[in-house]
UniProtKB/Swiss-Prot annotation:
Presence of keyword Secreted: no
Name of the featured protein: Lysine--tRNA ligase
Motif 'KMSKS' region boundaries: 325-329
Species whose genome carries this gene: Streptomyces coelicolor (strain ATCC BAA-471 / A3(2) / M145)
Catalytic activity: tRNA(Lys) + L-lysine + ATP = L-lysyl-tRNA(Lys) + AMP + diphosphate
Amino acid sequence: MPIVAQSTETTDWVSRFADEVIAESERRAPGKPGVVVASGLSPSGPIHLGNLREVMTPHLVADEVRRRGHEVRHLISWDDYDRYRKVPAGVPGVDESWAEHIGKPLTSVPAPKGSPHPNWAEHFKAAMVDSLAEMGVEFDGISQTAQYTSGVYREQILHAMKHRRDIDAILDQYRTKKAPAKKSQKPLDEAELEAAEGSGAAAEDDGSSGSAGYFPYKPYCGNCEKDLTTVTAYDDDSTELTYACTACGFSETVRLSEFNRGKLVWKVDWPMRWAYEGVVFEPSGVDHSSPGSSFQVGGQIVGIFGGEQPIGPMYAFVGISGMAKMSSSKGGVPTPADALKIMEPQLLRWLYARRRPNQSFKIAFDQEIQRLYDEWDRLDAKVADGSALPADAAAHARAVGTAAGELPRTPRPLPYRTLASVADITAGHEDQALRILGELDPANPIASLDEARPRYDKAEAWINTHVPADQRTIVRQEPDAELLKSLDEPSRQSLRLLLDGLADHWSLDGLTHHVYGVPKVQAGFPADATPKELPPEIKTAQRTFFALLYHLLVGRDTGPRLPTLLLAVGQDRVRTLLGE
């Protein structure tokens, strides 16, 4: 079998799962090509970065299996026939009037006002589909509305009804169990708890609420479309089913062998699909993996449908740093689209690839994003020179491309923090931004902003949407005459030393060397003396000198890194503001 793209072999968690998935697939269907992995997403509101783990975990495993030359299908089951449970807060174009649709299938709920999409589910699905395309995630999408309403699962539904007592007996083992005491965790805020919600209604009615016995099937009402229905009678031979709606009082008798307006309850629906699709690998969120949860119960119910439970790691929570400051209109839970506005898809893929599914991690929307980018660029350099550790190199390979090839990358990936500072100071003036970026490396200047894109655009979007106004950099229009007049002789001397060497050091590296060198030279040491050769007071002198420069240039104690700031302000203006 041909190897499509280089496999990273057994160096990280992804390759270990790929080994298991290939072996398990062969055990279940010897000699049959094709491996099936799955994700489930409920488009009940904005699909956020916690849900993205539901997709990225199987995607990375599927991609590794594909790199080894196997056929793979990554199914994304859109749980769009789930009931509409609540009106999410903070969604533009949605008000309390949407509460009247609670209980209907998500595909029967109107889309938010102004949406080009036909219904609620399609509206939220579309944003996720676009993000997955940008991230290079290949998948086969399956609408559960389409599956149920076209009768695809008819045999499975009739089979579940026939074996309802067996299903009830399995569920009954868990109904009386008390939930175990939860391990104490740091309290999560409401938005984070919402972000931890998985697909499918984890706490949904399991079909045992009716007085006529247990039924694993719930019709949607033929009059009001809601699932507030109770099955009151069912005949196995004729498949005649009678239900009554508690919302509107409607009741009818239908033939289940012909009726397509209802679904299996979640704890039965999920294992039915494992068997139907032959799923070998599907992860589950914390809410689906606890004792008595859908994943555990499903492992027993799947046998009734003649299938086996997939290999399925439980994935941990994805947190957000900078959540409070986020201007997200989503009621505080950012989506993959929000992240992709401020970071390249490679960085977002890397955050999911480098941590095992059971490790939680945070995605940065605050200053931390600059540090993450520094870390990514260092890894990029190590991979290029062959010094990266195997697991780090594997995560990098999974981030930059898939079995289908490399993702488009920024031709000249200049440091993110530099790009952010330049975007901050130039405030949308592209000609100024290009001038500054062209001076970063005079020996090899960039000729067009396109060379720094899309990274430049992401950094600019971050500055404009996630950096509070009081942290933005505003360069002084006029010199601070009062401060300049009050300076003592050592301070004046430090400014003279800086200005004298400005022209000769006018590049990012040159200015970095120069601003750190001035306090050393002033104290009688060579500019290139290392910290080990210097007394500790030099560090204090450097801090004092930097604070003085910030005050004279931007009127604050701190700001962007000085070399970037000096380049951004430009030589002539620096000389004016420093009193030359």
